Each structure stands twice: as structure tokens, then as C-alpha cells.
Amino acid sequence: MVDRAKRSPVPPLLYRVEEAAEALRLSRTAVYELIRSGRLRTVKAVSRRLVPVAALAEYVASLERAA
């Protein structure tokens, strides 16, 4: 039997829009605007719009380059 308490949690590869907003410290509306403008990449999986972890990193990198 595997002791689940000893296993490390698996980090998510995809975030719901609300989770992405929390990670970026932005409002949900602001994240949807970034998605609409093409500045934040998403994927569609099982009728859900999800934000890949890599897309969050790409967006933050673009902010750093623009600074």
C-alpha cells in the first residue's frame, strides 16, 4: 500500500483561468483580456479554456523584456 502522505503532490501543468489569475495576481477579467488580445496563450481541453504553465512563464518573460 502506498502512503499518500509521503508522496509529493504533482504540480499542475494546466491552470483554470481563475487559478492563472491568482498566480499572476490579476483579476479574472484582466486574464480574459490577455487571452482575447493573444498575449496569454491557452488550450481547450474537454470544453474548458486552460492556461498552460509554460504560457504563464512566457507572459511574465514578455513583461520583463518590455520593462
Protein language model regions, located:
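C-terminal secondary-structure termini that scaffold catalytic or DNA-interacting sites
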Residues: A66-A67
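A generic structural-conservation signal
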Residues: A30, V43-K44
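Polyanion-binding surface elements
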Residues: V2-E33, S37, A57-L63
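Proline- and acidic/polar-enriched loop/turn elements at helix boundaries
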Residues: E33, V46-S47
